[in-house]
Design a protein with these regions (language model features):
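Membrane-integrated ABC transporters
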Residues: 1-36, 41, 49-62, 70, ...
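An intracellular "coupling" helix at the cytosolic face of ABC transporter transmembrane type-1 domains
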Residues: 10-15, 82, 106-107, 123-132, ...
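Transmembrane helices of ABC transporter permease
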Residues: 15, 19-32, 63-67, 134-188, ...
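Juxtamembrane helix-loop junctions of ABC transporter transmembrane domains
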Residues: 25-26, 33-49, 54, 58, ...
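Helix-loop-helix
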Residues: 53-59, 152-166, 236-309, 314-315
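Alpha-helical transmembrane segments of multi-pass membrane proteins
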Residues: 67-86, 133, 137-144, 165-191, ...
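ABC-type nucleotide-binding domain
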Residues: 323, 330-580
Length: 580
């Protein structure tokens, strides 16, 4: 708990710290003001009612009214400070967390689910805000109210005060037991919330797949399981709280009744005045109410602690992929690619083994092979989404680990089969990598990707907002917009991972012609299964089980009569025994 509070405090700007301290000081002062009216009620009873002297009545009532109004005004100011400052603190925290996510490496996103990260950015951060705006001052308020009331009542009659607070040690023990038992339940509940949000997020993102397989009922059952597990985790916490709260309430009410009874005996014996007993009845709630609130405050504290811990995991996560201290700046990427005895393993499992090849600037390298052979991993290593386990990947004769990440990735334009388009206009999606593009340049790149014809037929043309992931467009249309986006950055290395898998042969030929006549020179890195997409490449690699099984030009690989030749025969309908 201490670490979470310290982390939150450290992330508050100095002005918000000051305002928060001022708000808490106001809270302490308003707790002192709580003593005024009970003290005046003593005079009202003893000096006015019992003495039958109406002269002080108006003055006492005016002071009581002024105290009440002043206290409410101060508390209003306090709440304004706490609410506005907490919102600003969380705004800055959310901004910093989002920045952390931008520079986290791919391994981080491999481990953390989208729904879980969304929960940390929203619900968990909101509990941090709730701590600043409510929990912190309510704890201080409860402690100060109890202490001030106890001290003041001691000056009135220490024996009766002792009777009123005698159950404090018992309440402290009950509170400690409750706090220990509820903490793991909150951690469990937080995990169930994350699982439920992940299930909802995946269902919404994959709604087309759900409908395509008619799995609506299955998804309903799956979400129902997550939803019920979350509800059950809540109920377990409530069960603990419902056991704790009645015990507190019973003890507090019992001691209040005993206090009134004993106070009455003191009056009969002349050891206490009616006005002094009025003070005890008026302030007994100030001594007992903090214990009543304790259950809710412990609940809130445990939720805050659990949520803040989840946020801190993201906040303190260190990216494994970052600029080296001696990273080199380059004026312009030329596009030479070299894989030098590269091996790559994830959790000990080999993905690539001893891969070596080189491509000169302006050349085209194509990679094919069975699914799971490691083709896409080559791209990930080239853009340094991951670091090699052995060997080196070089761009322009410089190890990619010595490149500045922004320069390295800024020189690579990537278009993949699994297209992600933003909920933005067509123009905004194409110009995503270069916000300075003019509309004419956007149109030129969409034309080269053979996307201009269908884009111009959209309701608002290039200003048409396309849905998340390109909802409303066909697979081939999404791929062509993604290709236009990759071309628009004028990359030195153009990566195409099955980019034309969803387009027809005529469109593919048009795109290939356009790529051969780009207004800038670039090295093309193509991953494909179609022979037609790679037959003109300067170097073709066949990757099987993470190793290069074959390499050469189209003609050379046909002569080897290996995997490439077999694929060629199958795709062109040539019986292998007749193929030359």
């Amino acid at each position: 708990m201490r670490n979470q509070i310290k982390w939150l405090w450290d992330n508050m700007d100095l002005r918000y710290r000051r305002r928060h301290v001022i708000a808490l000081c106001i809270s302490v002062f308003t707790c002192l003001l709580l003593l005024v009216n009970p003290a005046l009620s003593r005079r009202l009873i003893d000096d006015v009612i019992v003495a039958q002297n109406p002269d002080p009545l108006l003055g006492i009532l005016m002071v009581m009214l002024a105290t009440k109004l002043g206290r409410e005004g101060l508390r209003y100011l306090m709440v304004i400070f706490l609410e506005t400052d907490s919102q600003n603190v969380i705004y800055n925290l959310r901004r910093r967390l989002f920045e952390k996510l931008q520079y986290s490496d791919m391994r981080f996103f491999d481990v953390h689910r989208t729904g879980d990260l969304m929960t940390r950015m929203s619900a968990d951060l909101d509990w941090c805000r709730h701590f600043l705006s409510y929990i912190s001052y309510r704890i201080l308020d409860a402690v100060c109210t109890f202490l001030f009331a106890a001290v003041y009542l001691t000056t009135v009659n220490w024996k009766l005060t002792l009777l009123l607070i005698v159950i404090t040690p018992v309440l402290l023990v009950i509170t400690k037991v409750f706090s220990k038992s509820v903490r793991p339940r909150f951690v469990f509940m937080r995990e169930k919330l994350s699982e439920m949000n992940t299930a909802a997020q995946e269902n919404i993102a994959g709604n087309r797949v759900v409908k395509a397989f008619a799995r609506e009922e299955y998804e309903k059952r799956r979400f129902e399981e997550k939803n019920r597990a979350f509800m059950d985790s809540h109920l377990r916490i409530n069960k603990v709280w419902l056991t704790f709260f009645p015990m507190i309430e019973l003890l507090v009410n019992a001691i209040q009744l005993v206090t009134v009874f004993v106070g009455g005996l003191f009056i009969i014996r002349g050891a206490l005045t009616p006005g002094e007993l009025a003070i005890f009845t008026g302030l007994s709630w100030a001594v007992s109410n903090p214990w009543r609130e304790l259950g809710n405050l412990i609940n809130d504290l445990q939720r805050f602690s659990t949520s803040a811990s989840k946020v801190m995991e993201v906040y303190y996560a260190k990216p494994g992929i970052k600029d080296a201290p001696d990273a080199v700046s380059h004026e312009r990427m030329r596009g030479r690619i070299e894989f030098d005895h590269v091996s790559f393993r994830i959790d000990g499992k080999p993905i690539l083994t001893d891969v070596s090849f080189a491509v000169q600037p302006g050349q085209t390298v194509a990679v094919m092979g069975p699914t799971g052979g490691g083709k896409t991993t080559l791209i990930s290593l080239l853009a340094r989404f991951y670091d090699v386990t052995e060997g080196a990947v070089r761009v322009d004769d410089c190890d990619v680990r010595q490149w500045k990440l922004q320069q390295l990735r800024g020189g690579i334009g990537t278009a993949t089969q699994d297209v992600f388009l933003f909920s933005d206009t067509v123009e905004g999606n194409v110009a995503f990598g270069d916000q300075d593009l003019t509309l004419d340049e956007v149109k030129d790149f969409t034309r080269r990707a053979d996307a201009s014809e269908f884009v111009e037929k959209l309701p608002e043309g290039y200003d048409t907002i396309i849905g998340e992931r390109g909802v409303g467009l066909s697979g081939g249309q999404r791929q062509r917009i993604a290709l236009a986006r990759a071309l628009a950055v004028r990359p030195s290395i153009l990566v195409m991972d099955d980019t034309t898998s969803a387009v027809d042969s005529e469109t593919e030929r048009y795109i290939q012609d356009q790529l051969r006549n780009l207004p800038f020179e670039c090295t093309r890195f193509i991953i494909a299964q179609r022979i037609s997409s790679m037959r003109d490449a300067d170097l073709i690699l066949v990757l099987r089980d993470g190793r290069i099984a074959e390499q050469g030009t189209h003609g050379e690989l046909l002569k080897k009569r290996g995997y490439y030749w077999q694929t060629y025969c199958l795709q062109y309908g040539i019986p292998m025994k007749e193929a030359v």
